[in-house]
Amino acid sequence: MTRYIFVTGGVVSSLGKGIASASLAAILEARGLKVTMLKLDPYINVDPGTMSPFQHGEVFVTHDGAETDLDLGHYERFIRTTMTQNNNFTTGRVYEHVLRKERRGDYLGATIQVIPHITDEIKRRIIKGAGDADVALVEIGGTVGDIESQPFLEAIRQLRFEVGARRAMLMHLTLVPYIATAGETKTKPTQHSVKELRSIGLQPDVLVCRSDHPIDVSSRRKIAQFTNVEERAVIALEDADTIYKIPGILHSQGLDDFVVERFGLQCEGADLSEWDKVVDAKLNPEHEVTIAMVGKYMELLDAYKSLIEAMSHAGITNRTKVNLRYIDSEDIENQGTGLLEGVDAILVPGGFGLRGVEGKITAVQFARENKVPYLGICLGMQVAVIEFARNVLGWKDANSTEFNRTSAHAVVGLITEWEDATGAVETRTESSDLGGTMRLGAQDCQLEAGSLVHDCYRKDVIVERHRHRYEVNNNLLPQLIEAGLKISGRSGDGALVEVVEAPDHPWFVACQFHPEFTSTPRDGHPLFSGFVKAALAQHQKNS
């Protein structure tokens, strides 16, 4: 039977519920337990797929093609369970399903209410998402006290009562602020946050107290006394210099022992040696490189969360400190390529819309002409093809139909024919709905033997995740190939371009898929590892 750990947050947002939850999951997994994780998002959007990166941050794509919260990226980086569409749902998704059932008449004329219909649907989805795991950690987004979170909190209150105390527990994250003028940490916000929880029928079993200063034993004892939580279940979680230390910090305070005893689970002790190696490699690099990351959402770096983490993982596998120089592509348009001088490699990530595209194209040209290692991802591949068409093939008007629908040389175009779930072909245009209408999820890619990308993966066929609706125009592909563009990766059926490489260049790879979604700190990712190796070679050349 599955045990449930419900995770809530109080006092303020952005306390790190996702990382704390994933770290506990990693310890339980290291004890031989089968673990999964769920994220429940209170916003009314059906999914984050159409939300602005500035508002939501990254949209993490699962293996089965769901557009989900970025916390699922943390989950997959910390545990080896692959997330699916069942591991993340929103208020919008819940209401959509309930209303669809109401329209069909499934409720037999009943008045549809938050309790029981919405809460029942939330509970159903939690149980489904947990599957056959030994332990499921269920993170509720937002902060206790938010109006939006109330149906989710009521649902977990009900589910906790239904399965019993031996199968469900509540872990609450709070802030214990340090007041510099008083020279002490303050426990009152935590006390009030727990009081808010208890007012809706939820008593925490574990408190994880976040702080930027050490929390002494007397403060933890005081928190335990005022919140009815066992003293050993009051966990101090001070800011760490790397998030990959968190499993070790939680384990050192006995959190996993408390959970295992509470659930009556029989399992081995935790072997965190893999995490010790990750932390050692992260904090003790032997080399250093600087890589320019040229994007358009630089005001909120969470928009590139998985990519930034993937570069960190590549640094770990290469024992290299990777310094990312974040450059807004519009700044290149306004200030020129001087911003790129002195870097060891250039990375151009994905994005949508016209703004900043010309700056990305200029960055590609700089990398290609100056033999600087280049990695393009999604839009980063499309602008690489556009740049090649303009400056090598001589098509000065070359573009994507996303940016210029009247270009005579549209080397990138919209996918117009799609197979729906039944296999029927439907036509989509620029005016079609944006939500859920992209090429999404894991798909096969055939690699060309002898190519740079094949040297990285050492495989003929790979599986990577996608999130896009524009592709390289096959009608103009013969001219691009004749001019020297190398097609080193194609879709499983050979119909679509997946990877391109530039001729006469030490390391220039651009891919249509998103490799960052499958990179992990323990295993890294072959493409990012190869990219950092190329940056190292460039650095040594420039030294």
Swiss-Prot record:
**Which residues are listed for L-glutamine binding in this entry?**
G351, L379, G380, M381, Q382, E402, R469
Active-site annotation: C378 (nucleophile), H514, E516
Annotated residues for binding of UTP: S13, K186, T187, K188, P189, T190, Q191, K222
User: Binding residues for ATP, per the UniProt record?
Assistant: S14, L15, G16, K17, G18, I19, D71
Q: Which InterPro entries match?
A: Class_I_gatase-like, CTP_synthase, CTP_synthase_N, GATASE, GATase1_CTP_Synthase, P-loop_NTPase
Q: Tell me the route in metabolism or biology where this protein functions.
A: Pyrimidine metabolism; CTP biosynthesis via de novo pathway; CTP from UDP: step 2/2
Q: Which GO terms describe its biological process?
A: 'de novo' CTP biosynthetic process; pyrimidine nucleobase biosynthetic process
Q: Taxonomically, which superkingdom? A: Bacteria
- Give the binding site residues for Mg(2+): D71, E139
- What Enzyme Commission number does this protein have? 6.3.4.2
Describe the reaction catalysed, as an equation. Answer: UTP + L-glutamine + ATP + H2O = CTP + L-glutamate + ADP + phosphate + 2 H(+); L-glutamine + H2O = L-glutamate + NH4(+); UTP + NH4(+) + ATP = CTP + ADP + phosphate + 2 H(+)
Residues given in the record as CTP binding sites = S13, D146, I147, E148, K186, T187, K188, P189, T190, Q191, K222
Name the enzyme's class. Answer: ligase
Activity regulation field: Allosterically activated by GTP, when glutamine is the substrate; GTP has no effect on the reaction when ammonia is the substrate. The allosteric effector GTP functions by stabilizing the protein conformation that binds the tetrahedral intermediate(s) formed during glutamine hydrolysis. Inhibited by the product CTP, via allosteric rather than competitive inhibition.
- Which parts of the chain span the membrane according to its record? none
By sequence similarity, the record places it as follows:
Belongs to the CTP synthase family.
Further comment found in the protein's record: CTPSs have evolved a hybrid strategy for distinguishing between UTP and CTP. The overlapping regions of the product feedback inhibitory and substrate sites recognize a common feature in both compounds, the triphosphate moiety. To differentiate isosteric substrate and product pyrimidine rings, an additional pocket far from the expected kinase/ligase catalytic site, specifically recognizes the cytosine and ribose portions of the product inhibitor.
Q: What is the documented function of this protein? A: Catalyzes the ATP-dependent amination of UTP to CTP with either L-glutamine or ammonia as the source of nitrogen. Regulates intracellular CTP levels through interactions with the four ribonucleotide triphosphates.
Describe its assembly: Homotetramer.
- This protein is called CTP synthase
Q: Which gene encodes it?
A: pyrG
